UniProtKB/Swiss-Prot annotation:
Keywords: Lyase. Pfam families: Pterin_4a. CDD domains: PCD_DCoH_subfamily_b (cd00914). Belongs to the pterin-4-alpha-carbinolamine dehydratase family. It catalyses: (4aS,6R)-4a-hydroxy-L-erythro-5,6,7,8-tetrahydrobiopterin = (6R)-L-erythro-6,7-dihydrobiopterin + H2O. It is an enzyme of class 4 (lyase). InterPro entries: PCD_sf, Pterin_deHydtase. HAMAP family: Pterin_4_alpha. GO terms for molecular function: 4-alpha-hydroxytetrahydrobiopterin dehydratase activity. GO terms for biological process: tetrahydrobiopterin biosynthetic process. The keyword Lyase applies. This is Putative pterin-4-alpha-carbinolamine dehydratase. It comes from Synechococcus sp. (strain WH7803). The lineage of its organism: Bacteria, Bacillati, Cyanobacteriota, Cyanophyceae, Synechococcales.
Amino acid sequence: MASLLPQSERETLSNTLPHWQVEAGRLKRNWQFKDFSEAFAFMTRVALLAEAMQHHPNWSNVYNRVSIELTTHDLGGLSDLDVQLARSIDALC
């Protein structure tokens, strides 16, 4: 079961996940790809990760740009699942 991250861990996320922004109980990151096909391929890989974890992102896609927000709605903030999914997404890049 997921658990909310303690304040001490939330404060160090900028060091452990340097490409992600921490805002209002969410992790946020934006990507820009060569074209729509590359953006969609990335989203497909993320979807497979998220489905395997049963933890799904809030995201949007406009042509070659993808924005992802991670939060654990059931807990009302950032959890260890959000950090794990962010790390897995980073490993795809």
